[in-house]
Amino acid sequence: MGKTYIVEHLDEELGQWSELEYITIARETGNFCLSSIPSTLVLPQELKNTPGFVAETRGVEEVYGQDPVLKARVCLLDPAAKQELSPEDGDLFDVFLFGGILGDDPPRDRTSELRKKGFTGRRLGPKQMTTDTAVRVTRIVTEQRIPLDDIPYLDFPELKFNEHESTQMPFRYVKGDDGKPIMPEGMIDLIRKDSDKAIDDLF
């Protein structure tokens, strides 16, 4: 059975960075839910039209928290968890839950509210990841059964825009076959366009 990937949306707004990430997650997983969407938030049309994307105004606690059997099959990806995610977790869990935004720099403990709800936590290693990277790594571990430490990563890569302009990303990424960090389509252009802004302002 395919896995479900949920991001609990913890903001009143949805910036371009998050939109590109969420479109990528929906395309890659084919089963992506954005939960706790405020009724006042108008989602971008491209995101709503992306196959595999589901918008949910209810929080994950309301959807899964009432039934102990269902709740036990939900894994919270939590930087503070004691146990690392492992391939065996693909047998234990059907739903993987992420507290958006994982990609804050410096990291804020956005996951604490979900942690309080009692979901089982797993950690994705010591380095901060963007949300789409966290989902990608979770899929590699639980669906492809590749251990965390065997995944090729690029930590804090430098993006060169031209001879004079570059920026260093404060995150860990999965390394693509071309040797470059795997990022959402359009993300490098967004970063280049907004390179005068702080990374945190793009979310």
Predicted regions located by residue number:
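Histidine-anchored nucleotide/phosphate-binding helix
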Residues: 14-30
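Structured adenosyl-cofactor binding patch, chiefly the S-adenosyl-L-methionine
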Residues: 112-161
